[in-house]
Amino acid sequence: MLQAIYNETKDLMQKSIQALNRDFSTLRSAKVSVNILDHIKVDYYGTPTALNQVGSVMSLDATTLQISPWEKNLLKEIERSIQEANIGVNPNNDGETIKLFFPPMTSEQRKLIAKDAKAMGEKAKVAVRNIRQDANNQVKKLEKDKEISEDESKKAQEQIQKITDEAIKKIDESVKNKEDAILKV
């Protein structure tokens, strides 16, 4: 019964860390990633559709992305969606593909993006702490219902704290690695 709580807590915290790493992939670092376009939706016959669902997105080099739509009539719509997304780049439509030329990041931009990464890390820590609180509440309920003793409850809460500390440490490492990648010139 306690082991199930530990396992669920670890699993939920791991999912929070994975979500953080997914969020990090949308932040720009030295090399532009195709993931920077993940949040962009294109109006595809009246339905907001992810950009990578209406064409292929590939990286040509460290500062250039190319979008090749599967239907040429979507070029204007993709171009409009990118402009509205305000990602700091103007789309270059050549009639076949759209190229995005990202300028090199200034040190000021790098600092702002690193700050965003840190904020994402803090959000993940809050999620982990909420998971810890839920797990501790489950343990306290078991103690209240006389299913476990007070000593078992204290040991369980200590174990949950150890799991939380591990998750927070992983989040801190992820944030540090991402900040290093962003600030590296």
Curated annotation (Swiss-Prot):
It comes from the Bacteria. The keyword Metal-binding does not apply. Keywords: Cytoplasm, Protein biosynthesis. InterPro entries: Ribosome_recyc_fac, Ribosome_recyc_fac_dom, RRF_sf. GO terms for biological process: cytoplasmic translational termination; translation. Residues 137-158 are annotated as: Disordered. It is found in: Cytoplasm. One of its GO terms (molecular function) is ribosomal large subunit binding. GO terms for cellular component: cytoplasm; cytosol. Residues 140-158 have a biased composition (Basic and acidic residues). Responsible for the release of ribosomes from messenger RNA at the termination of protein biosynthesis. May increase the efficiency of translation by recycling ribosomes from one round of translation to another. Belongs to the RRF family. This is Ribosome-recycling factor. It comes from Helicobacter pylori (strain ATCC 700392 / 26695). The lineage of its organism: Bacteria, Pseudomonadati, Campylobacterota, Epsilonproteobacteria, Campylobacterales.
